């Protein structure tokens, strides 16, 4: 046994002398040593980064268009006025709901696109961010069923039915609460996923540090605002004002990725 222990270093040295083994080990050590410092951006990453910018802008446009008619423009309107508008413009109302649904689907597409861009930085964190954002897309799209039911109640208010106006108003309020709860949960998942993606952008220096850092902060704000809106649904409209910085950060990120693209990471000193 002592003889084997004394000769083992020589056996190891002879193993490295085998043709091909030394070169293979050298390449492996060089690869491991440069990992984290060599953040070479591939053409695929650049393509997907610009695609991410397009998807972000498309998501914002789809969401604003859908909500502008069904929510924003209906602010301050009575139940009867909203029901009359929905009944008289049924096709427009449903088209706006479709637009909102497509905006939730775009969140899932964006999750995969950002995963392709940031997976080389840290695969585990990128996978977690992907799961969170895909969950947000699923929950948000599922919550749309409440708004579809709400639209049907608006249509029913203009025809003879078994429900009185007060009963329909109560049912609409219930569907609004259900939709709002689903959206706030989706926001929490979105914010958590976005925070991880921006963290990877910060680590890789693919985005300016200020923009990536601000993205982490606004994503955390989105999670907090969503949690508060879930607990205090009557304060949702006031809490939404705190989401303006998150919207501006999204727009800035989209424009940067679309027109500037990814910036390679500066090589480590020493």
Language-model region placement:
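Hydrophobic, aromatic-enriched alpha-helical segments typical of multi-pass transmembrane helices
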Residues: 34-270
